[in-house]
Amino acid sequence: VIDIRPVVLVVAMQSELRHLTLPGSGALTALNGIWPETRFSIGPLPVIAIRSGIGMVASAAATEHAISHHRPRCVLNFGCAGSHVRDQYPGDVIIGTQSVAHATVRIDHTGEEVFASNLFTVGQDGQGANVFASDGELVALAQEAARDWQPAPWPVGDAPRLPEVREGVIGSADVWTQHHPRLDLLHKRHLTLCEDMEAAAIAQVAGLHNVPFLTIKDISNNEFLDATDFSDEGAGLLEVEVGRRAAELTRRLLERLAIRN
């Protein structure tokens, strides 16, 4: 029996999404309510990519829209991320085994910050879990897709090796962390390899609907190595490169899902 349900992609930025919907892919984009949806197929596999905009609220809202309207077989997220560890370089790719909403904290009366690892509960009203495991089958399929694949080198810098694929925890919040001690704290607390502003929110909504989820990120900056260049020149480079390698691995994953259809 052929599964006709689509795969939904929730992607923050057009600069990321465009690497997957290349000219000649047959992709068609139209608004569905407020959401730009791009539809294309990989073999028999229907794909709907929704550009959510940046941030936890926007990506959660886009995911709820996607699931309620399209009843997907799974939800995928890809894009760029900032490293939480020193030995990653721009161009490295992370298969997210977990996503954590790392800004879900309590600041107690002493000023100490305590991560709320599970619930904020008042009566019967809870926020829910803040750590979300990716679907095991999708992780395994992404690992298979990454075998014998070499991500393209980052065009600038002096990385001592070619980009590589890793697996680990993605941290998410409406925060861009540049302070080295804070990066170290987040990595120690959560074992995060990198941070973005969407994955955990998408994972939470997908989990509420029991829809399998996976996130794939590529490293666009490592503040331990070089402070992010916010100049026009630096922004121009990022616009060209962000999400490119994560998109390529996502396409390889989609091709394998199409074969299994």
List the model feature ranges, each with a label.
Residues 223-261:
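His/Asp/Glu-rich mid-to-C-terminal helical/loop segments that flank catalytic regions of hydrolases
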